[in-house]
Amino acid sequence: MAFMEKPPARKVLLDDTVPLTAAVEASQSLQSHTEYIIRVQRGISAENSWQIVRRYSDFDLLNNSLQITGLSLPLPPKKLIGNMDREFIAERQKGLQNYLNVIMANHVLSNCELLKKFLDPNNYSANYTEIALQQVSMFFRSEPKWEVVEPLKDIGWRIRKKYFLMKIKNQPKERLVLSWADLGPDKYLSDKDFQCLIKLLPSCVHPYIYRVTFATASESSALLIRTFNDKGTLKDLIYKAKPKDPFLKKYCNPKKTQGLELQQIKTYGRQILEVLKFLHDKGFPYGHLHAANVMLDGNTCRLLDLENSLLGLPSFYRSYFTQFRKINTLESVDVHCFGHLLYEMTYGRPPDSVPVDSFPPASSMAVVAVLESTLSCEACKNGMPTVSRLLQMPLFSDVLLTTSEKPQFKIPTKLREALRIAKECIEKRLTEEQKQIHQHRRLTRAQSHHGSEEERKRRKILARKKSKRSAVENSEEQPVKHSNANNSAGSGASSPLTSPSSPTPPSTAGLSSALPPPPPPPPPPPPPAGPSPGTEMPAPPLPQAVNGVNRGALLSSIQNFQKGTLRKAKTCDHSAPKIG
């Protein structure tokens, strides 16, 4: 792919690692049985959901298929009599919901083909073993020296990747394993670059990479052949498992698990970090490190499945690191996955959840230090260390590796540029998915907080306080409105409230009624003996209010008095003497 050339348009492929959630919404009783309506959702978007209808017998069939795991799953028991009662159906519906919750909480079970077909039959109805056989048969037409011995059924966790035990016709005792895989959602290479890089893998030589004997690819899949190893993978060593057994049987509920000795942890860890650094320096994206992808050859670990990133397949731990926005490059993904691997080597089992709040006692504090730098809350929040930084930590810095094999992996400049662009596209999709999950988590937390009992109580208290405050404000506004009305009514002619005949005490709300009444006014002066002709009689004095209400109103009127509201008056002076 040329510089700055956009990846070719392609159809959107399903990411099998995106978690499915299922909710039993309702039930409907027919003549002889009951059907349960289940809402299934892929990922965080409610728009990406659908309904399925399942009977109890379908659940029972799924449960029988999962017995290979050895897990005791909480499927509600069968009932022959009274199984159509309303109360029984409601109780069974709750039990079936709990059954689905337990399965989907298990990382291995949630990714298995049995559950995917049960919940999403439209996308998982194909028989990938038959598809793989067809592709392999077409390949054998041009390469007749290979022969299929038997299919290795379900030895891996991927739904769209199948394995076959092979042999060469002229070397019947030598056993090989063929892996066939479909394209994944992160395939951003052009078809030409993709096929060239797949065919380049047999030329990769490194003491800690498991050799590829043969590799070829079509526009839609890839096929690789490697030597079959009877000892199996690092995960087989930890879980005491047989390599040919199904993945669910080997790793879902192992009877015996054992962590490795400290020296093994140091040696294997150093070897794996060295090969990761080699790939990072070459610009080759990996992102698929886990214990089942590390082959054991004597006392040496060798990395498997370099083709996965070229095919665009999602990582085994993708549902973990999509929760943390700082794990947003393939290098940081490799370091985080190394933390999972180191935990499994140390304790003989994967962590119950990630991030890990506290680590159990280990054979060395140096082990815990590396685990804390890759799996702790702080590490997941702030970001992963580099591979070079891990190599400098005390757990690995003093490990001496002795090997005579010189690493070789020549990638042409054009293909290296294509890998760089594809890597950026993979990281961009990862970043976008992490952003969506982060926004969804914030929205969910806000909705949960808004609907919590504590938040409802707080809103009730605030509403009560607001109601009391409004009532107080309304009660304070009433006297003001009353005084304004009185003021506007007496602002024209003379009014007893504006009479200056008696002073009024300072107004204080609530105190006017408590003050003693004023002393009675002095008696009016005696009237004149007789009015002179043409003079007007003075108006008789008005009675003065003696109750507290009128006193308060009087004070309010005086305080609110505005000179501009008075009407202009025309004065007629009759004091001048009249001359007859």
UniProtKB/Swiss-Prot annotation:
**Matching PROSITE patterns, A to Z?**
PROTEIN_KINASE_DOM, PX, WH2
Name the keywords, alphabetized.
Actin-binding, Cell membrane, Cytoplasm, Membrane
Segments forming domain Protein kinase: 88-481
Cite the WH2 domain residue spans from the record. 549-568
Give the compositionally biased regions (Pro residues): 515-531
Q: Which GO terms describe its molecular function?
A: actin binding; ATP binding; phosphatidylinositol binding; protein kinase activity
Q: Name one GO biological process term.
A: inflammatory response
Is Cytoplasm among the key words of this record?
yes
The PX domain sits at 14-126
Q: Which InterPro entries match?
A: Kinase-like_dom_sf, MONaKA_PX, Prot_kinase_dom, PX_dom, PX_dom_sf, SortingNexin/PXDomain-PKLike, WH2_dom
Physiological role: Binds to and modulates brain Na,K-ATPase subunits ATP1B1 and ATP1B3 and may thereby participate in the regulation of electrical excitability and synaptic transmission. May not display kinase activity.
Name used for this protein in its record: PX domain-containing protein kinase-like protein
Q: Which organism is it from?
A: Rattus norvegicus
The upper taxonomy is: Eukaryota, Metazoa, Chordata, Craniata, Vertebrata
